[in-house]
UniProtKB/Swiss-Prot annotation:
SMART domains: Gp_dh_N (SM00846). Its EC number is 1.2.1.12. Pathway: Carbohydrate degradation; glycolysis; pyruvate from D-glyceraldehyde 3-phosphate: step 1/5. Belongs to the glyceraldehyde-3-phosphate dehydrogenase family. The gene is gap. It comes from Bacteroides fragilis (strain YCH46). This is Glyceraldehyde-3-phosphate dehydrogenase. Signal peptide: none annotated. One of its GO terms (cellular component) is cytoplasm.
Length: 333
């Protein structure tokens, strides 16, 4: 059993917890949660969720600890990860999901506190290696601190890999139409660095930057410098969609591209890349554990070398499931 600690019980921290209990119960045991909020409120936020519904299990607080389905989970409220004493709960892996400790230097405080490995649930801000499960996880070589990249990179990388493997990508532009996240404002408010990002999400489509496309070059070096992209933040609570437009080296019809995606979804990328031929919309993918679901009916091509492909992702649930998958990978080495 892999013992996992979670630092930061926000959207991703809670979804990683739920995924571990629901889909990885035979492999992963959550042994500790560090968050500055009090125990009763952490239990409440785990139990009830506006997007994903009620937690399927028993949740209680006892003597300052969280009790979930009879299992005791240590709760702490430390600002500094160096004080977390992960050795006391034998943490094999710590999921760093506060969004604050995204360099080797800062995340290493978990190692100093007794954790064996650390997964950042966001792109690293330094040279910490990034992994996308299903795309480059087999190249993991025992590093004690890794990044699970972003939810958007986890959606984009599988389809980019299939396109490049089968047809070759000369260059490409990505747009993600992205659901709202916790950093956004419900009404207009101050945002010094990103003025547009300070506008209210309830009534705006907000153009934003994203490093997700460039990050694909880190998990697939063959595509380094060939992709870039942007985001539109939209007034939905969950599920986002990647629109990737590429110039291909080899000529390909949309039927051939669809066939390549379907083959990959049933083969090497099964469980990571999904495939649909249905007339779907975003809420149809809420709760889907695949990180990228290719929409065969949404893609278009201008000619045999210029095509647009579309892939959906539950930016909370799909991503969090792959954090758990990567925890299994790094705990095994």
């Amino acid at each position: 059993m892999i013992k996992v600690g979670i630092n930061g019980f926000g959207r991703i921290g809670r979804m990683v917890f739920r995924a571990a209990v629901k889909n990885f119960g035979n492999d992963i045991q959550i042994v500790g949660i560090n968050d500055l909020l009090d125990a009763e409120y952490l239990a409440y936020m785990l139990k009830y969720d506006s997007v994903h519904g009620r937690f399927e299990g028993e949740v209680a607080v006892e003597d300052g600890a969280l009790i979930v389905n009879g299992n005791k989970i240590r709760l702490t409220a430390e600002m500094d990860p160096a004080n977390l004493k992960w050795n006391e709960v034998d943490a094999d892996v710590v999921v760093e999901s506060t969004g604050f400790f995204l360099t080797d230097e800062t995340a290493r405080k978990h190692i100093q506190a007794g954790a064996k490995k650390v997964i950042m649930s966001a792109p690293s801000k330094d040279s910490t290696p990034m992994f996308v499960y299903g795309v480059n996880h087999t190249s993991y070589a025992g590093q004690d601190i890794i990044s699970n990249a972003s939810c958007t990179t986890n959606c984009l990388a599988p389809i980019a890999k299939v396109l490049n493997d089968k047809f070759g990508i000369v260059k490409g532009l990505m747009t993600t139409v992205h659901a709202a996240t916790a950093t956004q404002k419900t009404v207009d408010g101050p945002s010094k660095k990103d003025w547009r990002g300070g506008r209210g999400i309830l009534e705006n489509i907000i153009p934003s930057s994203t490093g997700a496309a460039k990050a694909v070059g880190k998990v697939l070096p063959v595509l380094n410098g060939k992709l870039t992209g942007m985001a539109f933040r939209v007034p939905t609570s969950d599920v986002s969609v990647v629109d990737l437009t590429v110039v291909l080296e080899k000529a390909a019809t949309m039927a051939e591209i669809n066939a390549a995606m379907k083959e990959a979804s049933e083969g090497e990328l099964k469980g990571i890349l999904g495939y649909t031929e249905d007339a779907v919309v975003s809420t149809d993918f809420r709760g889907c554990a695949n990180t990228s679901i290719y929409d065969s009916k949404a893609g278009i091509s201008l000619d045999s070398n210029f095509a647009k492909v579309v892939s959906w992702y539950d930016n909370e649930w799909g991503y969090s499931n792959k954090v758990c998958e990567m925890a299994r990978v790094i705990a095994a080495k």
